């Protein structure tokens, strides 16, 4: 067996004493629950092994006819004030409802983990894209240095970590980090957006003034090239950015800044990705019956991604985390379809739903 194959196996199989988590070879466990036939926002979401999905601050990727869900893997018994991420986890699905655990695709506890990863205070909000120029999968994530090096708050500095893989299920090889906005402070919450001309952009909250800025990434996708610019028309303090395109319009869904507490969703529209943007009304409608929170609290969630569904017409899913800072491993998820009324996005609460709400192309 080649060393590279052994390395791949050991990267997937390890015991994390810090998280009291045992990861097994993906695919060996047999499903032990009834397949899910609907998406139930705000309800516990179990994988095909009957275990709560552990992939927070997440994004999704379509590739090869399957969908991949990437998120931060939270550790049992840890709060958001502690180092609580074991790495980036991946789940795969053929129907967006039933998800098979693929294990950690990037681990901070792997024997050969880079010191940047092993010592990181925070490693979250992963985004994965496929780079056609290199035939590699690129994983971007928010990477904070050790808390004692993070300034007064422990979070004053934030990097953008980058890793690559030949497969969507990893393992991913850490390639280093870059400083968003070319600033010593770096940037916070971010999105990765591919424009119609193929250009890929890193969009992030600039530290310390919280303006939303964008910079173009290199062809290989490992670092930004050129200067960052402010997205004109986007309110200062807009975080958790998620972009999607409908026709000739680009929409930005985000939130305000209120720590772990939910706040009203923010929505903007522009004729092109680089702006200028115009603010639209809060798109949320209805009440989440599980916590009695409505539009003024985004159903208790915070936006993390807007997913365009392949093979469906005008089909997007607005995706949210339900933050639970005292017990993040058990934090939840909200997925809701995006409707359009008078060309404005509307995100209406539904207790459960399936893909039949969208028209096939």
Enumerate the language-model features and the residues they cover.
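Intrinsically disordered, low-complexity regions enriched in serine, threonine, proline
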Residues: 9, 27-30
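Carbohydrate-active catalytic/glycan-binding domains of CAZyme proteins
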Residues: 30-361
């Amino acid at each position: 067996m080649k060393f590279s194959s052994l390395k791949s196996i050991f990267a997937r199989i390890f015991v994390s004493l810090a998280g009291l988590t045992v990861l097994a070879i993906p695919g060996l466990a047999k499903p032990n629950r009834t397949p899910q036939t609907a998406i139930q926002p705000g309800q516990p979401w179990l994988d095909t092994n009957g275990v709560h999905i552990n992939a927070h601050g997440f994004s999704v990727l379509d590739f090869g006819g399957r969908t991949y869900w990437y998120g931060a893997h939270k550790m049992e018994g840890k709060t958001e004030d502690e180092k609580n991420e074991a790495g980036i986890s991946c789940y795969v699905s053929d129907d967006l409802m039933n998800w098979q655990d693929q294990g950690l695709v990037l681990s901070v506890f792997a024997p050969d983990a880079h010191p940047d990863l092993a010592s990181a205070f925070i490693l979250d909000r992963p985004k994965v894209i496929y780079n056609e120029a290199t035939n590699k999968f690129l994983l971007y994530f928010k990477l904070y240095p050790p808390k004692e090096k993070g300034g007064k708050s422990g979070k004053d500095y934030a990097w953008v970590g980058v890793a690559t893989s030949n497969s969507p299920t990893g393992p991913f090889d850490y390639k280093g980090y870059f400083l968003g906005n070319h600033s010593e402070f770096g940037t916070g919450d971010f999105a990765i957006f591919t424009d119609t001309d193929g250009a890929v952009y890193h969009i992030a909250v600039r530290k310390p003034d919280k303006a939303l800025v964008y910079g173009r990434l290199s062809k290989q996708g490992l670092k930004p090239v050129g200067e960052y610019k402010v997205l004109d028309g986007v309110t200062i303090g807009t975080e958790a950015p998620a972009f999607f395109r409908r026709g000739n319009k680009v929409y930005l869904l985000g939130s305000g800044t209120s720590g772990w507490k939910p706040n009203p969703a923010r929505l903007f529209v522009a004729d092109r990705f680089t702006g200028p943007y115009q603010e639209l009304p809060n798109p949320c409608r209805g009440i989440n019956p599980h916590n009695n929170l409505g539009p003024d609290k985004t159903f208790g969630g915070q936006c993390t991604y807007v997913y365009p569904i392949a093979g469906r017409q005008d089909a997007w899913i607005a995706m949210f985390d339900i933050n639970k800072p005292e017990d993040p491993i058990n934090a939840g998820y909200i997925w809701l379809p995006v409707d359009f009324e008078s060309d404005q996005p509307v995100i209406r609460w539904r207790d459960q739903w399936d893909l039949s709400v969208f028209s096939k192309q």
